[in-house]
């Protein structure tokens, strides 16, 4: 078995990302990171890069967003030596919960964390997700973390889709992006 060698995480993303035209709607090119995450060498480089930045940002916890943020966030937290917060979509946790609603193109959604059993007061959280597009989900996660008494010390994503305003929306803390979208 040949193990691919990549110069860095950016090269791994560029080599392994799958582009799917007209998904989820005509005119959109979906950038599927599944092959990137499935490649052990690529995944390792990405986790190392995100963990290095999480430590630089002073993370006490990594906040992984449902669902791919769970995969990335867990590995990053392990590597950085922090705890992991699984920031869930509404309805996945038993009550009581902290909840933060946010707008979608066609409605609303919410993110939740348990209201009991977590000691987040005065802690620093780095939020981790796979893709930054409009920034709506990460912004809602920030508000949720703040409602729990913690501070978001930074955001870390694998891929940023340029031109959708996500970077501007998240201007309250440092943003780490490994690779910009190739289709922007």
From Swiss-Prot:
Location(s), subcellular: Cytoplasm
Top-level taxon of origin: Bacteria
Protein name (Swiss-Prot/TrEMBL): Adenine phosphoribosyltransferase
Gene Ontology annotations for the cellular component aspect, listed alphabetically: cytoplasm
Pathway: Purine metabolism; AMP biosynthesis via salvage pathway; AMP from adenine: step 1/1
GO biological process, any: adenine salvage
Function: Catalyzes a salvage reaction resulting in the formation of AMP, that is energically less costly than de novo synthesis.
Known catalytic reactions: AMP + diphosphate = 5-phospho-alpha-D-ribose 1-diphosphate + adenine
